[in-house]
UniProtKB/Swiss-Prot annotation:
The protein, known as: Holliday junction branch migration complex subunit RuvA
InterPro entries referenced in this protein's UniProt entry, alphabetically: DNA_helicase_Holl-junc_RuvA_I, Hlx-hairpin-Hlx_DNA-bd_motif, NA-bd_OB-fold, RuvA, RuvA_2-like, RuvA_C, RuvA_C_sf
Ranges for region Domain III: 157-205
Gene3D superfamilies in the cross-refs: 5' to 3' exonuclease, C-terminal subdomain, DNA helicase RuvA subunit, C-terminal domain, Nucleic acid-binding proteins
Organism the protein comes from: Shewanella sp. (strain W3-18-1)
Amino acid sequence: MIGRLRGVLVEKQAPEILMDVNGVGYELQMPLTSFYELPEIDHETVVYTHFVVREDAQLLYGFITKQERALFRLLIKTNGVGPKLALTILSGMTASEFVGCVERDDIVTLVKLPGVGKKTAERLLVEMRDKLKSLMEASAGSEREFVLQSNYSPTPTVNSAEEDAISALISLGYKPPQASKSVSAAYKEGMDSETLIKAALKSML
């Protein structure tokens, strides 16, 4: 089990990164909430991981905090929610927004996420309510503190902002026309890709 990596960030293209750990390159997929807290290329970083072994692949999912990883692990225990959908959920909204949806029984917001239909949203609301309650009690408030705060801080990129934003949304499950339309509508002069992705996602929720 690979639970934590410390190494140099070699590549990053939302939602994937490549880390050099003692000469070994690790490819990871990350939710955008974690991705945009990463340092610049060639800087050292620490990433908490969840390792998935399938018949056709071995996948690593990365998170900036142990708390966000814990929330990811709760999500994939929900019937009908796999790692890819859990990653999409945590990319489409912050942890605090997700918890807010659960507390308010806000099915309308959840079904706007790609891959989340009405039945899946209903299961999330029912199953995650009890799981989150147990998590908060077990952690004596530390997880609660996490999910009610967001340290999201976009950093500039040298790539085309609109192209990167569209590519990131498509990788999360949005259809190309929908991704292109939302990015074009959200774009303002001078926006970097991270800010643009956040604005485009918000416009669809």
